[in-house]
Amino acid sequence: MPEYRSKTSTYGRNMAGARALWRATGMKDDDFQKPIIAIANSFTQFVPGHVHLKDLGQLVAREIERLGGVAKEFNTIAVDDGIAMGHDGMLYSLPSREIIADSVEYMANAHCADALVCISNCDKITPGMLMASLRLNIPTVFVSGGPMEAGKTKLTDHKLDLVDAMVLAADPHASDEEVAAVERSACPTCGSCSGMFTANSMNCLTEALGLSLPGNGTVVATHSDRKQLFLNAGRTVIELCHRWYGNEDATALPRGIATFAAFENAITLDIAMGGSTNTILHLLAAAQEAEVPFTMQDIDRLSRNVPQLCKVAPNTQKYHIEDVHRAGGIFGILAELARGNLLHTDVATVHSKTLGEAIATWDIIGTQDEAVHTFYKAGPAGISTQVAFSQSTRWPSLDTDRTEGCIRDMEHAFSKEGGLAVLYGNIAQDGCVVKTAGVDASIHVFEGSALVYESQEAAVKGILSDEVQPGMIVVIRYEGPKGGPGMQEMLYPTSYLKSKGLGKQCALFTDGRFSGGTSGLSIGHASPEAAAGGAIGLIRDGDRIRIDIPQRAINVLISEEELASRRLEQHAIGWKPAQSRTRKVSSALKAYALLATSADKGAVRNKTLL
């Protein structure tokens, strides 16, 4: 049987010094025979999705200790993409994913931890910890801080979120008072932003991957039911330790759970729920860490066969994550996919022998278990707070309407093709991605003239000064992982297009990426990126570009000869922006750019250069 990794620093006379230091942390004689379980917390006061996590690591720790383990907590960094948005701070967001992954690996390996609990929540933290867990391949459980409650104001009938505040702020017809009212109401509680944005998308995907407990992605941060998720995470990691170190059960390890089939399940869920396009980037990165050959081609293949069964903000103003939970949460969607024979139900999870068994237990349509029904009635209280587990409000009933409800069955899908698609063409030879869930059907085929910007800042200025007109395709390049560096999110350009009434009259194409809050004909992750010699760098103002989502195609309508001629010309002068940019790029960002791959590889480090 495998030995505890921690024996390296706790066993034998030569480790007297290490044990002396362990004792100084509070360990006693009996503790040196127990598994040492690392708790990677991501508490910070900078991020609403993490502001309430300070004491939750110790909540898990006490449960681990009660069940016979030794718990040791440490913290990672966490960047708030919304606060970093629209200025040079966004250059640091995606690179922070690698820093988080490295820091978890460093702490777990330096101290020979036997297992891991990941307390994550927002955009790059869950992916970074996911990458680390698959590198380490020690028993691991994920538990997130949970989603924020949606906001409310007397000015609108629909619920609010961060994107509403951004769009209204750019609307010249909105008064300062209206903007202030929405600003104060859009983000009322702690938790990850309330729509199907990147953070919530990733926390939902950990359920499909099998690495977190049911409800991880959908129980609001303020609800008392989430406390039980944290306690259960402590219990589950102890069980996983027993299974691996006691029985050498490989399905207790992240790589035994997050197999190729599990990655297919995760992207199938992602497509069905219309998740953030960032999830594609992060799943590809995680697959590489797991040494699973999961690629853009697999995503393209699945996107053609999976319908959209759930539609949540920003793709509609009717539903937020709290509504998904009321409709049965992620297991509600997984159950419908399973009924459509679109899932691998024989894969393992941290909490059940197989995903199929878990669906049978947690599907609100199929089970009569009142405890499960009560669990999925956990709802928002509508009280502004930064305190976790501070309310116990329950919906009076579940949303079991699979015809017109938040979650649909296969027959009544929002669309027969899912919410994400991969496009290929002469300006995206290795692919690009679009969240079709947020694209009006009338512009699934769109042709327009290119208006090229060499940076997000220039594009924002152009949109706000009315350079962009109906029928144009805004091209923003040199914003990829290497070219940015850091692959900025383009939420401001897309929000401003909406505020100008151009959401259905223009498209945006970039080698950067989009916030989970983005909707509209916004196509990102163009690969190869411009800085890596990608053809997006060859587009010129006035070029006609044709986007055809049904055919999964995007092309600039010029001859191959002209494209080749432009390539030779560009190669001679170098793949860099035509206009200089006043952008401060630190040595840390330059180091990231030196190794960064394009988005089709997950924007991970190019290991061939190491």
From Swiss-Prot:
Positions annotated to bind [2Fe-2S] cluster: C122, C193
Q: What pathway does the UniProt record associate with this protein?
A: Amino-acid biosynthesis; L-isoleucine biosynthesis; L-isoleucine from 2-oxobutanoate: step 3/4; Amino-acid biosynthesis; L-valine biosynthesis; L-valine from pyruvate: step 3/4
Keywords in UniProt for this one? 2Fe-2S, Amino-acid biosynthesis, Branched-chain amino acid biosynthesis, Iron, Iron-sulfur, Lyase, Magnesium, Metal-binding
Q: Where, by residue number, does Mg(2+) bind?
A: D81, D123, K124, E489
Report the SS bond pairs.
Answer: none
- How the cofactor binds, per note? Binds 1 [2Fe-2S] cluster per subunit. This cluster acts as a Lewis acid cofactor.
GO term, biological process aspect, one: isoleucine biosynthetic process
Gene Ontology terms for molecular function: 2 iron, 2 sulfur cluster binding; dihydroxy-acid dehydratase activity; magnesium ion binding
**Which residues catalyse the reaction?**
S515 (proton acceptor)
GO CC field: cytosol
**What EC identifiers does the entry list?**
4.2.1.9
The modified positions for N6-carboxylysine read K124
Reaction(s) catalysed (UniProt annotation): (2R)-2,3-dihydroxy-3-methylbutanoate = 3-methyl-2-oxobutanoate + H2O; (2R,3R)-2,3-dihydroxy-3-methylpentanoate = (S)-3-methyl-2-oxopentanoate + H2O
Q: Please give the function described in this protein's UniProt entry.
A: Functions in the biosynthesis of branched-chain amino acids. Catalyzes the dehydration of (2R,3R)-2,3-dihydroxy-3-methylpentanoate (2,3-dihydroxy-3-methylvalerate) into 2-oxo-3-methylpentanoate (2-oxo-3-methylvalerate) and of (2R)-2,3-dihydroxy-3-methylbutanoate (2,3-dihydroxyisovalerate) into 2-oxo-3-methylbutanoate (2-oxoisovalerate), the penultimate precursor to L-isoleucine and L-valine, respectively.
- Assembly state and interactors? Homodimer.
Q: Which NCBIfam families match?
A: ilvD, PRK12448.1
What family does the entry list? Belongs to the IlvD/Edd family.
What name has this protein been given in UniProt? Dihydroxy-acid dehydratase
State the gene name recorded for this protein: ilvD
